[in-house]
A protein has these predicted regions:
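Central I-helix of cytochrome P450 enzymes
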Residues: 1-19, 46, 73, 77-81, ...
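Cytochrome P450 heme-binding "Cys pocket" and the immediately downstream C-terminal segment
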Residues: 8-10, 126-166, 170
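Cytochrome P450 heme-thiolate "Cys pocket" and heme-binding signature region
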Residues: 68, 104-133, 158-161
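Conserved beta-strand elements of beta-rich interaction domains across eukaryotes
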Residues: 77, 84-85, 120-121, 135, ...
Length: 188
């Protein structure tokens, strides 16, 4: 949500997609999320810039090996820095920019996009997490108009300290129910 508040054009594009695909007579449902391509692009770009954890779960090398030309003795603890991989200029054009459109073309999420890990040790909750994120963010976008707190300027995206990279400054946002969704919200 923080990134969308700083990029209102992306927020409006996601809202327009939801309105066109789902309408305003019901809430976004689980079956809708796979059809909301731009919303999924927003989620992918957000997870690229701010993975849930900056490094994957540590692993231990079972034997001597070479990684990137470096000798790694057996028994060495290995960490994969997803945060750095997702911001590597060799893999991503303009890596610090929030550009959900980069995921619109086929194969854009390829090898270098791995917020949940990859292979046998990939997070088993990835599908559930993406479905839940799609439902929650989609519903928030569908039901409310969002803005940064008046006079605050852009949302501060500075990172705090912690395993999950929390914001240094907690998010404060203003939301107003969308007039077209008031009847649906009343029925909840």
């Amino acid at each position: 949500m923080s990134l969308l508040l700083n990029h209102q054009e992306a927020l409006k594009k996601a809202q327009a997609e939801i309105d066109a695909s789902v309408g305003t007579s019901r809430l976004v449902g689980a079956a809708d999320v796979p059809r909301l391509g731009y919303l999924r692009c927003v989620l992918s770009e957000t997870l690229r810039l701010y993975p849930v954890v900056p490094t994957l779960i540590p692993h231990e090398s079972t034997a001597d090996c070479a990684v990137g030309g470096h000798h790694v003795p057996g028994g060495t603890m290995l960490l994969v820095n997803v945060y750095a991989i997702h911001r590597d200029p060799a893999a991503w054009a303009d890596p610090a920019a929030f550009r959900p459109e980069r995921f619109e073309s086929a194969g854009a999420d390829g090898l270098f996009m791995m917020p949940f890990g990859m292979g046998r040790r990939k997070c088993p909750g990835e599908a559930l997490a993406l479905q839940t994120l799609g439902l929650v963010l989609g519903t928030l976008i569908q039901c409310f108009d969002w803005a940064a707190v008046a006079g605050a300027g852009e949302v501060d995206m500075a990172e705090g300290v912690g395993i999950t990279l929390p914001r240094a400054v907690p998010l404060e946002a203003m939301c107003k129910p969308r007039q077209c969704m008031v009847d649906v919200l009343r029925e909840l």
